[in-house]
Amino acid sequence: MTVVGPPSTEVALVHAWDDALGQPAPRRGLLLLGRPDADRLPVGEVTALLLATAGGWTGGRVATTVDCPTCPEQLEVTLTVADLLAAAPQRADRATGPFTLRWRGHRLTLRLPTPADLAGAAGAGDAAAAERWLLDACLLDADPPLADPSAALPAVSAAMAERDPLGVVAVALTCPGCGGGTEALLDVPAWAWHAADVRVRRLLDEVHRLARAYGWSEAEVLALGPHRRAAYLERVP
């Protein structure tokens, strides 16, 4: 079963999860959106869609951990979906389509990075090479041409961050163990996939218990809905 649009029911979620399992791990979160163009949308738009889709499976919270770079401490980060979505552009057209940036006498025509761009940049080598790869992909035109495109990177990055604030979800942290500072970067597609995976495996556990107890099929168990299903589960030894 191929899902069109985000899964809106438990049955649709199970099928979306099943379809995504056959794909490479980095793509699974995107596939939850059920959109063939998901990897060609601006990263911030994908982030907002995934937050809205998966937030209901996590109680509206986004949790992650990051290792302190200077001591063995592991830092926990918990954000709310509502707070993150509040950072999204308020106008529907703000984060879509090409835009222009004037920089040192140049008129740069740019587009925002997409998940497909990030995947391509990941294979470019080190961080500097990845940044240059993204600039080459997202710079549509420069008038007059740039002699050294990398010199424009700071200005381009700042303009993209202003236009698409959910393009990178980063949280500054202070380690309680050593007092050092670090930054947590949230991989929203990976978080959304983990949330879906946890939710579906819990559903399948419930299906397994009720199927053994009553002989029902998966479809029949999921059709009960969460409240009736919970009531039956209370009665299973």
What are these regions (language model features)?
Residues 1-237:
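Long C-terminal interaction/binding lobes of large macromolecular proteins
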